[in-house]
């Protein structure tokens, strides 16, 4: 069973490792450089909320929510999701997504927007569309893959 709870200081190494594995994989995150634990701590501290997915006392995923834009755009949330590579296609991403939508509502956000969903990331595209996100645009070649191929990215939005 997957439990989703607030991120705790003891989770920092696990969340850093999750993030860095996805960066290294090179298929979905814009970041190219791994983060130190201190850099991840700083990143998490700058977010409005961070949660982790835990199974058998092991952190297997996480997400963090922040304002998509400052000031007059701060009523729209954005979030980043990390699911351990060995825990994909097991419902972890969906559980994190559903939890994040509920959390964003509680925090008073009016919508959720994702600015860079790689169009070839079929599980992610399927997840967001199944959760009633609408694709509001495409940026042709907006993601430079590790093989130097340029892939399209989609912008998704859902009212809360």
What are the language-model segments listed below?
Residues 17-33:
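Helix-loop element at the rim of GNAT/NAT acetyltransferase active sites that forms part
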Residues 28-86, 97-98, 103, 159-160:
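Acetyl-CoA-dependent GNAT
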Residues 48, 151-155:
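Short hydrophobic/aromatic beta-strand or adjacent loop that forms the aromatic wall/cage
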Residues 104-117:
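Conserved GNAT acetyl-CoA-binding A-motif
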């Amino acid at each position: 069973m997957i439990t989703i709870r607030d991120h705790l200081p003891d989770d920092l190494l696990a969340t850093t490792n999750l993030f860095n594995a996805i960066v290294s994989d090179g298929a979905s995150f814009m970041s190219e450089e791994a983060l130190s634990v201190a850099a991840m701590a700083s990143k998490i501290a700058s977010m409005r909320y961070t949660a982790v997915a835990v199974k058998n006392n092991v952190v297997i995923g996480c997400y963090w929510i922040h304002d998509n834009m400052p000031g007059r755009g701060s009523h729209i949330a954005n979030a980043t999701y990390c699911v351990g590579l060995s825990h994909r296609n097991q419902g972890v991403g969906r559980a994190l997504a559903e939890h994040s939508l509920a959390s964003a509502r509680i925090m008073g956000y009016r919508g959720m927007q994702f600015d860079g969903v790689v169009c070839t990331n079929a599980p992610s595209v399927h997840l967001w569309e199944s959760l009633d996100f609408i694709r509001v645009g495409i940026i042709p070649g907006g993601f430079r893959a590790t093989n130097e191929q340029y892939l399209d990215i989609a912008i998704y939005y859902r009212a809360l």
